[in-house]
Amino acid sequence: MTDLSIVSVETTILDVPLVRPHKFATTSMTAQPLLLVAVTTAGGVTGYGEGVVPGGPWWGGESVETMQAIVERYIVPVLLGRGVDEITGIMPDIERVVANARFAKAAVDVALHDAWARSLGVPVHTLLGGAFRKSVDVTWALGAAPAEEIIEEALDLVESKRHFSFKLKMGALDPAVDTARVVQIAQALQGKAGVRIDVNARWDRLTALKYVPRLVEGGVELIEQPTPGEQLEVLAELNRLVPVPVMADESVQTPHDALEVARRGAADVIALKTTKCGGLQKSREVVAIAKAAGIACHGATSIEGPIGTAASIHFACAEPGIDFGTELFGPLLFSEELLQEPIRYADGQVFLPEGPGLGVELNMDAVKTWTRN
């Protein structure tokens, strides 16, 4: 058997341009920074993971720069000499050295899974119990352009059968203006595609109580994290108020968070990101709690590149608890392809990459081009 002991860990920061600016409630970005983590074994196998947050530290306090420092200074010493098949022992040891920093830990967790699976000649989903499906539904995030342009973009995507469900970001504009814009789009797409919204936790209780019902009346099919993540009692109040699903994102980053959401009845759906949870292992714990509580899970995104997206696809295809679709569209937002063969999107689905490990191969020329100097 190939020697699985870790002999080197390398990190690289990339800045990959996007096809258009991507707007959140508090920021926008024209390029997505990625931290590439490469774990190499004595047997000559390299596995890759990706540290990524949506546009910087505004979301969870981490950035590619902090992730790189944490991985290189504190996590690498835990890894060297260990086997890539020791994930269940390695990750708790990392927890003892580094608190929080879940996005950095996710990059390492995925790199270990990729290296181990490649060493065995099997896909990552095999290590997770095996894939029970080969594709999952994928929602597309629409931009911040005027409503007429957004409607045209969405209808074009429906016509081409690439997407049948769309998300709109809110929270950056005046709530009345924001709501009117979203309702205009939702009504234009009614009967053709679903529309959901994400406020990125930027509304207070009174604003949410005023505008969330208007959004639902206007045809919005799902409300994601309208209020601050820690205010579970407000999220629960909104969940009782409206007849459409309420989804928790910022409110759930750990298994304990999922337990609290379940106890309070704060959400019908959890936005499960393998990044914010700290990797594939911790993500399984979150999904297990959600399943036990009867809460659905949605395969959400931090705008990952192809490595992070491939990892989340493997997870979603191996985990029946991801039962509310996904938004694993990250690579489609990038203007530059980082893989030798792109991840496949068609018919409103994203397809499981085939082959050992994550089933994708980096184009190292493209990686070099977009490496930060």
UniProtKB/Swiss-Prot annotation:
Pfam assignment, any one: MR_MLE_N
Residues that bind Mn(2+): 198, 224, 249
InterPro entries named among the record's database cross-references: Chloromuconate_cycloisomerase, DgoD-like, Enolase-like_C_sf, Enolase-like_N, Enolase_C-like, Mandel_Rmase/mucon_lact_enz_CS, Mandelate_racemase_C, Mandelate_racemase_N_dom
Catalytic residues in the record: 169, 169 (proton acceptor), 327 (proton donor)
GO molecular function ontology, one term from the record: chloromuconate cycloisomerase activity
Gene Ontology biological-process annotations: amino acid catabolic process
Keywords, ordered alphabetically: Aromatic hydrocarbons catabolism, Isomerase, Manganese, Metal-binding
Transmembrane parts of this sequence: none
Cofactors that this protein relies on: Mn(2+)
Xref: PROSITE patterns: MR_MLE_1, MR_MLE_2
EC number: 5.5.1.1
Chain coiled-coil ranges: none
Class of this enzyme: isomerase
Keyword NAD: no
Database matches in NCBIfam families: mucon_cyclo (TIGR02534)
Family label: Belongs to the mandelate racemase/muconate lactonizing enzyme family.
Entry protein name: Muconate cycloisomerase 1
Origin species: Rhodococcus opacus
